[in-house]
């Protein structure tokens, strides 16, 4: 089988993967490349959510074709974001409307199946991604802040 010259491939995922490969060629340590997609769990995951994860994963897969560097895909939930409006498809709009401007992870889940409104939507996202066999790691901003994982970075920001 003839070897593909990926530098000549014009498909945008390969173009983006090559940009990443070229950029990291200047970095000494190349143990792992992380591809990340963000999700705002203010409502149910939808086709736009799927498209963002799919596009990121397409670039990741192309990167794996042109590189031997291991990769991870992270689905990062911005579940500390505030609720700006009540989604039209939510079953308890009158209850949810009382929590406008509240962090998504501090809003109760009115279906009583999850720890919070954000946890409900995060689980819907994970079910959605699992249905399509995405290889990813899920990270919640609420849990990341609570764990202290961001503390040293936040302190650096405050010092500058």
Task: List the predicted regions and their residue ranges.
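Cysteine-centered nucleophilic/redox motifs
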Residues: 52-64
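Non-catalytic terminal extensions that flank enzyme cores
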Residues: 1-47, 61-75, 87, 91-97, ...
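Conserved aromatic-histidine-acidic binding/catalytic patches
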Residues: 8, 42-51, 113, 117, ...
């Amino acid at each position: 089988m003839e070897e593909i010259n990926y530098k000549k491939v014009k498909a945008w995922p390969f173009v983006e993967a090559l940009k990443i490969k070229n950029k990291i060629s200047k970095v000494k340590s190349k143990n792992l490349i992380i591809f990340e997609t963000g999700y705002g769990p203010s409502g149910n995951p939808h086709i736009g959510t799927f498209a963002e994860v799919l596009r990121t994963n397409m670039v990741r897969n192309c990167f794996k074709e042109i590189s031997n560097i291991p990769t991870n895909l992270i689905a990062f939930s911005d579940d500390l974001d505030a609720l700006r409006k009540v989604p039209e498809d939510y079953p308890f709009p009158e209850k949810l409307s009382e929590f406008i401007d509240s962090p998504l992870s501090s809003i109760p889940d009115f279906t009583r199946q999850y720890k919070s409104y954000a946890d409900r939507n995060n689980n819907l996202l994970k079910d959605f991604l699992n249905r399509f066999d995405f290889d990813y790691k899920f990270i919640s901003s609420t849990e990341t802040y609570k764990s202290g994982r961001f503390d040293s970075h936040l302190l650096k920001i405050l010092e500058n």
